[in-house]
């Protein structure tokens, strides 16, 4: 959810840049909406909480209220699911009802784009921006691939103070480490991660690390890895973000993100923090690592094995092709670009 919404911001920014007088509304689940507070390209965040998503009648009621209160000139249905199509169903007088080509979208969307075509080799941001193309009928579109998050100076200052109290020395680099994942199949081999972190600590004596994890299994996993590393003083295991905006403030106060691909990496890129991420076979790096002005690199099985060889291997074997040596070589190459 975080990654999808983050990459969608480039479309919001493209629309605001192209139509500065337009009012841009962004529809999101409530649990991630706080990230987009204060965004200059988003005039209003419309949220759906659990009680508004279910039962279905409650969802329909909320969609009807939103569409009838706002009477939109343009609806861009980025997901184009049966549920999201109700925005267009209740807005048949809206001149531009834009979305994806699917079998069931023909009747309700009057501009459809194939953002998941097998012929596309573009990243997710570029695919999202295809949805702005029908608006070229109004005026030329000024596209941007930049997606940004905005924190207040006070938010960043408060979290920096907390980090200092926990022992962070801002005279030295601070790495945010995506050491674990919510979904087990997306997590790089734990022993490989331990080997790589040990080598970073050995060869970069000034680097400090903060492990990023959520409560529950992720925290348990992160603390086990910390113990396996020998509980080094340079890893601050107890620095925790209690909300998404605090996670953003944590990212904003770090020098670099390294680790498993996920929402925190997208947040880092949106805050112009450089990164290097490890992509599982189930997450296409070419799609989910968008290129823009921020240094963001990564590694996936596609960088190592040709498709015909991957076709003969199990998921685990493909993931294991990303060895600590390959990760370290590419990580250090990325770090050299920064220095």
Task: Describe each PLM feature range.
Residues 1-339:
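Catalytic machinery of carbohydrate-active enzymes
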